[in-house]
Amino acid sequence: MAAEPRRVSFRDGRLASRKAEEAALRRHQAATWLESVIGPFGLSRCPSEQEFVAAVRNGIVLCKAINKIQPGAVPKVVANASCDSQPSTAFQYFENIRNFLVAVQELKLPCFEASDLEKDNIDAGSVGKIVDCVISLKSYHEWRQRGGSYGHLKHLKSPLATRSASHVQSEYVCSGSSSTPKRLDLVETDTERQPNQNVGPNCQEAMERLQKVILDCMISCKENLDNDSLKKDPYKLVGTILSRQLEKEQSSNSQVENRRRLLQAQESELLELKSMFQEVKIDFRTLKTQFQDDIIKLGDNVQGLSKAALGYNQAVKENKSLYNLLQELRGNIRVFCRIRPLINSESISSIEHIGNDGSIMVCDPLKPQTTRKIFQFNKIFGPTTTQDEVYKETQYLIRSVMDGYNVCIFAYGQTGSGKTHTMCGPSGGLSSQDLGISYMALNDLFKTSTSREDVKYDIHVQMVEIYNEQVRDLLNEDTSNIRTSSNGLLNLPDAKKCPVQSPSDVINLMLLGEKHRASSPTAMNHRSSRSHSILTVHVNGKDMSGNVTRSSLHLVDLAGSERVDRSEATGDRLKEAQHINKSLSCLGDVITALAQKNSHIPYRNSKLTQLLQSSLGGNAKTLMFAHISPEADSYVETLSTLKFAQRASCVELGTAHANKESNEIRELKEQVENLKRALAAKELEKSSFKLKENTVVRERAKQVPERTPPRPRRLSLENTGIGKGSIPDRKGPKSPLSVTKLNRDHATIHDSIDGFNHHIMHQGSVMQMSATSSEDPVREETEKIITTVDTVPFCGLHPDAYISSKQSGLDTLLRTPCRSRNLNLEVGQTDEPSSSAKLEKMTSSNATKKGSHLRKSIQSSIGKLIHGSERRNVQHLGQATPAKIANSTNNDVPSSITPDLRLRRRQSLTGLPPPPSTMSRRSSLGGKSDIGSDKRGAKTPPPVNSAAKAKRWL
């Protein structure tokens, strides 16, 4: 009995040493592997339990190792450079170790507890768990490197698991002892250590010792089983083993056969899959070829469609440009329609359809049975259209202002439809996205003027309003003297014209104008404009060559038409509404008259139409914005606005022309203006002089009836200025002749004159005129009066002939009535006396019958030769009395026939300036004066044969 305890203690010591060796070997493997994975970290190749635990206590080494095996397993590692045995911080302990254990559990590897790393609780069991965890990581890493093949991963948790059964049995045989002494030894050892330890660690040690006792019991039981199997019959045992082995072989053979069959089936399936793969490959190639062909065809089709689309777009663009060109050539008023968004989302809209071609369909939602109305305009802007999109459609029209064209844009519609918003923008602010057309237009004009460096532009701005039919300046405090020009154009000479240099100046002027503009809230609009606002931009450009362009841009914000029952206007608002509706009604009348091409356009019925006359009926490009409200209760106003806009679109203003003037044309115009002014001054001087002369004539004419009227004289061919006071007929008044007889007499006179000229050229006769003596005071006074009568030159006379006549001595002819003189026509010395007798007989027979009618016919025939617009007052330089004529023409020798004899005779008949006063009127006709040889007195009546001679001369 004494030998058993010694045998048991020997066996226990041997087992403990073997366990220690195996534990040291595993620590060596773990340390070596950790160093190979993460590099040297200050741990020896054969560390003790304390050194190993101290190296891995902070968790940095373990986290780095598992991150090498499984990248990203521990996303955050709290680093600590110290690798000594100092205790780690709580943060490192709970962060690194916790993250490592979580990662190990995800890999389904054996792990340990965080309490195993406590310094005061280091024993073989806790260190073994840590080493087992590291070894399992090593095995997992090697398994991963092999690609995860060759079976499943197996983990060895303790050194006792590798011990073979035979080795255990030999140890048991050698020991040959029971477990009772060992148990006593364990109890004794436990009782010896119990007073020196605390309660907590004692419990844990007791559990570990209990595990060891259970393990020893299991080993002893296995040794007993082995001893029992040896005591059996070896033959039976061999037979049993062989039978079991055969069964295993048969089962393995059947499994092999099954696996072979499965392999064959899989091989056949693989062959089928290969054939299918080949077929699929062929099909894929075929489909690929077809796909490529389809892509090529599709590309061709797309290219054709793109060409067609490009051609279509180009055709649409050309059509649009041609349409715009046609509109410009016709001068139609362009009409854009803009729809205001619904104020209340629950309201019913009267707009049913908006077409891309500029068509709009409206219907009364309150009366669905009514007929739908369709209107066509140049452009329709929906409720979601921005200010920038609206301006882009009008930008080309506004930029033409810089080219010299006049442009007018006005907004029309009922109150509250968004006219002021379109033209001036919102009242709250001036953001770049909400700017009105007025601001964006001026900004664009400044950009264009800056880009054109070869042209210098001067831009001025005027802003006025029409409030209750009164024009007021919005840029000036004093608006009492504003008036329109007399020609009715959009020209306000008294309105303040402000130069602008930048968009900021424009914004300041706009704000000033909006501040002064009349506006007040109504039941339909909280900011209702109570006046028509007109913004005029004057652009004057001058290029390097001196060419000048003058144009103007008129931006008109009309006040909205309103119904008094809806707007609830009273007092001043009612008066304003009445004036607004009246002016808009006048505008409608003007548009209707222009559309119907009436001869009379009522521009002067309103100040608004007066100011818009140059845009509606002049040389300007005009655009109208028709604003409508989509609400159902505004359907009547909407329909009225659309009808008005449709009438306006039919108005043709004609082709607008650029207001360009070259330097040469401007200089010529200035010269023409200077000449006109000089001519006007000259005409003024002449009119004043003529007024003085007429005054003298009237004063002298009053004295003529008081004197004794002169005796009737014969008709003088030189004097054609006779009037109604001609020679009275002694036999009484005669009945007037018919028009046919007068024309016949007129022809007879011309034939007689031509015959007389022919007779003079061939016979060389001389015409002589007898003048009355200067003793007759009445005749002298009449001659003085007649000198002031207008003498008109012959319009058909060549200037050279007139100059030659002046140089030859022709002077102004006195147009004297027949009653003021006693003129005798005599034929000079001729070789044929019968001709003189015949002439006297013809004159005496016709003088008593056709005297007055002949004079009228001569006057009418000669008056037709005179151009009325060239008549002027020519005063005779010197009054030639009969005495002077007698003294100056006392030569009895017949004069020779000169080449310009007929020209002088025509001048005497038509009132052209005669030769100088030194020659007598008889000598001017080419004859010889017989004043000196005339024996008759001043008041002696002419002989009877004188009439016959005159008739013969005719």
Curated annotation (Swiss-Prot):
GO terms for biological process: microtubule-based movement; microtubule-based process. Disulfide bonds: none annotated. Residues 831-849, 886-898 have a biased composition (Polar residues). Residues 24-142 form the Calponin-homology (CH) domain. Residues 242-293, 656-692 form a coiled coil. GO terms for cellular component: microtubule; microtubule cytoskeleton. Keywords: ATP-binding, Coiled coil, Microtubule, Motor protein, Nucleotide-binding. ATP binds at residues 413-420. Residues 332-651 form the Kinesin motor domain. Residues 697-743, 824-858, 882-954 are annotated as: Disordered. One of its GO terms (molecular function) is microtubule binding. The keyword Nucleotide-binding applies. The keyword tRNA processing does not apply. Residues 697-709 have a biased composition (Basic and acidic residues). Belongs to the TRAFAC class myosin-kinesin ATPase superfamily. Kinesin family. KIN-14 subfamily. This is Kinesin-like protein KIN-14A. The gene is KIN14A.
